[in-house]
Amino acid sequence: MFLVSAALAQQSPAAPKRGLPPVPGLGPDPVLPANPTAAQKEEHARQMAERTRQRWNYLLTDSLMRAKVLNEKPNALLVETVRGLKPGTALDADMGEGRNAIYLAQQGWQVTGVDIAEKALAYAQNRARVKGVKITTEVFDMAKYDWGTNKWDLVVLSYAGGREYADRVQKALKPGGLVVIEAFHMDATEKLQVVGGDYRVFFKTNELPKLYGATSLKIVRYEEPIGTADFSKQQLRLVKMVAQKP
């Protein structure tokens, strides 16, 4: 018993989890009172949505924050997937600062990017103009957005979305259309501090292929590698998937 305790005592303490940088001027999250009324729940949700919008506007448009936590190159899985494909219509859900949308536009795709962070979309539009390409952007919460039916040849979910997106993706894709997903494996929570308990972009082993396979999509590629995350730039376990609508 002593030897075990001594060995444990010699181990280095666990490294602190890394979270999102604080947003200047944004105080602590509002607290929902005990036994809240429907009106209080609605107001709390509104306040949290507004804080989320402010947080992402800051992280995605502040040059120092982008350099610290974001890969400014297009997602590698996306680049590999579309190489050699005939360009078509693409939806970049929760687009952010536009790195993937702009890349697709440069390859000839007609891209629509949707996000709640209006400043990030404006930043993306400016970058697109500088690079001489056109993208369409819409300020919207993807949870309330009309994805359409048989509308897109490609849907991109790069560190974006939630479990409820699977059915919407299946409905929105054209026959033969692809969805490209990269997100965090749940193991990444050992190193990342999850803001507000929001695990929408964290998935358990084989959770993604089960979710999307259940919608009738064909899983073309699935991996759970250790790699540098596009968001956070840390070495973490990731989930990567490409699926196709029959």
Please identify what each model-predicted range represents.
Residues P16-L85, P87-G96:
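Conserved class I S-adenosyl-L-methionine
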Residues Q110-D115:
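Conserved SAM-binding motif I beta-strand of class I
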Residues A117-K119:
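Conserved SAM/SAH-binding beta-strand->alpha-helix loop
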Residues K131-M142:
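Conserved SAM-binding strand-loop segment of SAM-dependent methyltransferases
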Residues Y145-L154:
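A short acidic, Gly/Pro-enriched loop at the edge of an enzyme's catalytic core
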Residues A160-L173:
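A short, conserved alpha-helix within the catalytic core of class I
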Residues G176-A188:
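Conserved beta-strand signature within the Rossmann-like core of class I S-adenosyl-L-methionine
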